[in-house]
Amino acid sequence: GKTEPQRAKRTLSLPQNKRVVLLMCGSMGCGPIKDLAELLPQQLPEDAILVIICGNNVKLYRSLTKYPLPDNVRVIGFTSRMPLYMDAAELILTKPGGLSTTEAAVKGLPMLFIDAVPGCETRNIEFFISNGCADMREGAIELCDAVCDYLEAPSKLNKMSQTLKTEFCGCAADIIRDYIVKDADCVYGRL
């Protein structure tokens, strides 16, 4: 399910009056996070904050929290509260891996892809971009520009979110279960 953004922000102790940009690159915290952590806070509008999820990458977490952070940045290590962070966010910068993209898609969270691994992730990029659900940029400067462009044009984010909500069902497990039960009923009689 999806928690209302204001409630998610309250639960996570994030400012209620700020839009959340979520930055994550999988459980290992890879990708251009350091460059983005330095550049993006300088460019974000005043009504936005950057939440960086480092995952299991303790070295990255320590390097990002070694010095005082700007007021518009939060750095999180490993967390079991990813669904809440996604519910609080307006945009996620993430690798186009299967789990992250599926969870974001089901939640209707627009995606900006970074640091793709050739193969499966390339297909994910093609699929989501061709369906109007995501975008991609190469390099930290281009990513920062894209984030600011999207935040300045909420209608683009809303359109991506609506497309995701229309195209992706959060109840896939229920549909599969119902199909199996129906098929079993046909083959074996009423269960």
PLM-predicted stretches and their roles:
Residues K2-Q6, D135, A140-I141, C148-T166, ...:
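Conserved donor-nucleotide binding/catalytic region of nucleotide-linked donor-dependent transferases
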Residues A140-C144, G170-V181:
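Short, amphipathic alpha-helical "lid/cap" segments that border enzyme active or binding sites
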Residues M82-R123:
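A donor-sugar binding/catalytic signature common to diverse glycosyltransferases
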Residues T3-A88:
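Donor-nucleotide binding loops and adjacent catalytic segments primarily
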Residues V51, R74-I76, L91-L93, L112, ...:
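Hydrophobic/aromatic beta-strand patches that form the interior of the parallel beta-sheet core
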Residues V75, L93, A104, F128, ...:
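Hydrophobic, well-ordered secondary-structure elements that form the walls
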